[in-house]
A protein has these predicted regions:
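Active-site cores of enzymes that catalyze phosphoryl transfer or operate on phosphate-rich substrates
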Residues: 2-67, 129, 152-154
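Short, low-complexity, polar/charged sequence segments that are solvent-exposed and flexible
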Residues: 20, 30-34, 68, 79-83, ...
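Weak global preference for isoleucine
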Residues: 17, 38, 47-48, 59-62, ...
Length: 209
């Protein structure tokens, strides 16, 4: 169920129920089979609240919850996502943060993730500075995806764009970025990367990069 009211508040609600899943095991020597319960009855819930703000800004709250019958794994993840822009919409502060809580066989595993990104996104000269931190136990995978964990990253992006047309050029952009990653626990070096690029669009809208 989804909808948005006249004041710009959006609401989304999702619910699904999954039945039991079984696997059949067979002994190669005796040929005997055994039916094994691998997943119990599961209830999947999601709720999203999204509020439109002035200057094309917004703030959102998201919660996902998975409850499984018996001693199977339960999961709860709550998070916020926001994008705040000034009146001219050329500067921004955006980010997100979430907390996961996994419970399995009376063992609790809490984890967290947060991202903050500030920058300038219009004009000839644009930039942004981003910091991201993901704890070792952060786990949204019951109703989400996780590409990396136990990591913190700092990323700087800088670009200069020319929008004034010339005889052959429509617009062009030169960019530079630097990224520095460290593992959280233990605190050790993980990655360092530099990247440069150039994008060119001619008057016939042919692109080169």
């Amino acid at each position: 169920l989804t909808g948005r009211d006249k004041d710009g508040l959006g609401v989304g609600v999702f619910n699904a129920i999954e039945g039991r899943s079984y696997a059949t095991l067979q002994d190669n020597e005796t040929g005997e089979t055994e039916k094994l319960l691998i997943n119990s009855v599961s209830n999947f819930n999601m709720i999203v609240l999204d509020k439109n703000l002035k200057n094309n800004s917004y703030i959102s709250f998201i919660n996902t919850n998975v409850i499984r019958q018996g001693e199977f794994r339960d999961a709860n993840v709550s998070g916020i996502d926001f994008d705040i822009r000034n009146k001219k919409q050329n500067y921004f502060v955006k980010g997100n943060g979430s907390f996961s809580y996994i419970s399995e066989k009376e063992i609790a595993k809490p984890g967290y993730k947060y991202v903050i990104d500030v920058g300038k996104n219009s004009g000839n000269f644009t930039y942004d500075l981003l910091y991201q931190e993901i704890s070792k136990r952060y786990d949204p995978t019951d109703m989400g995806f996780l590409g990396i964990f136990n990591n913190r990253s700092t990323i700087l992006n800088i670009a200069y764009s020319t929008y004034v047309q010339s005889k052959y050029r429509n617009k062009s952009t030169s960019s530079f970025s630097v990224q520095y990653d460290r593992q959280l626990k233990p605190d050790v070096f993980a990655n360092f990367a530099l990247e440069t690029g150039h994008f060119y669009l001619d008057r016939n809208f042919n692109a080169a990069q």
